[in-house]
From Swiss-Prot:
GO terms for cellular component: chloroplast thylakoid membrane. InterPro entries: 4Fe4S_Fe-S-bd, 4Fe4S_Fe_S_CS, NADH_quinone_OxRdtase_chainI, NDHI. The gene is ndhI. The lineage of its organism: Eukaryota, Viridiplantae, Streptophyta, Embryophyta, Tracheophyta. It catalyses: a plastoquinone + NADH + (n+1) H(+)(in) = a plastoquinol + NAD(+) + n H(+)(out); a plastoquinone + NADPH + (n+1) H(+)(in) = a plastoquinol + NADP(+) + n H(+)(out). It is a peripheral membrane protein. This is NAD(P)H-quinone oxidoreductase subunit I, chloroplastic. Its EC number is 7.1.1.-.
Length: 167
C-alpha cells in the first residue's frame, strides 16, 4: 500500500510542477504581448540604413584615373576597367568601367583604397532582377544616384510611420 501512496504523491508533485512551468511560460508570453512589433511591412515601410551601410557602389567617371587599384584590392577581381594609353598626354584614358553586382560581395575594399574617391557606397540595397545579366552595371548605371527612400511618397519609413507618432 505504501508504493501506491508514494505514487500518488509523485503524481501530485509532477502535476504541480507542470502547472508552475505552464504558468511561467504564460507570464513570459504576456510580458512580450505589450511590446511594439519589431518587424515591418517591407514593401510599404523601409528601414533607414545606417551611415556605414555598404549598398550599391556609385562611380564618378570624371574622377577615375584608371589606376586599377580597385581591381587589385578586390578579393574576386571584380571591377572591369578598360582604358587606353594616350601617348600625347602620357596618361591613361578610361574607356569603360563596370561591376557585376551578382558576384560582388560588397566588402568595400574598392571604395576604401580608391586614391581619387571616385567610388562610394550608397544606401541602395534593392538590386533584385529577373535576369542576372541586368546586375552587370556599366559606368552609366553606376553613375546614377539612387532615389532617396525618404523622398518616395509611397514608402513610409519606420520613423515616419503613423503607429510611431501615436506612441
Amino acid at each position: 500500500m505504501f508504493p501506491m501512496v508514494t505514487g500518488f504523491m509523485n503524481y501530485g508533485q509532477q502535476t504541480i510542477r507542470a502547472a508552475r512551468y505552464i504558468g511561467q511560460s504564460f507570464m513570459i508570453t504576456l510580458s512580450q504581448a505589450n511590446r511594439l512589433p519589431v518587424t515591418i511591412q517591407y514593401p510599404y515601410e523601409k528601414l533607414i540604413p545606417s551611415e556605414r551601410f555598404r549598398g550599391r557602389i556609385h562611380f564618378e567617371f570624371d574622377k577615375c584615373i584608371a589606376c586599377e587599384v580597385c581591381v587589385r584590392v578586390c578579393p574576386i577581381d571584380l571591377p572591369v576597367v578598360d582604358w587606353k594609353f594616350e601617348t600625347d598626354i602620357r596618361k591613361k584614358r578610361l574607356l569603360n568601367y563596370s561591376i557585376d553586382f551578382g558576384i560582388c560581395i560588397f566588402c568595400g575594399n574598392c571604395v576604401e583604397y580608391c586614391p581619387t574617391n571616385c567610388l562610394s557606397m550608397t544606401e541602395e540595397y534593392e538590386l533584385a532582377t529577373y535576369d542576372r545579366h541586368e546586375l552587370n552595371y556599366n559606368q552609366i548605371a553606376l553613375g546614377r544616384l539612387p532615389m532617396s527612400v525618404i523622398d518616395d511618397f509611397t514608402i513610409r519609413t519606420v520613423l515616419n510611420s503613423p503607429q510611431r507618432k501615436n506612441v
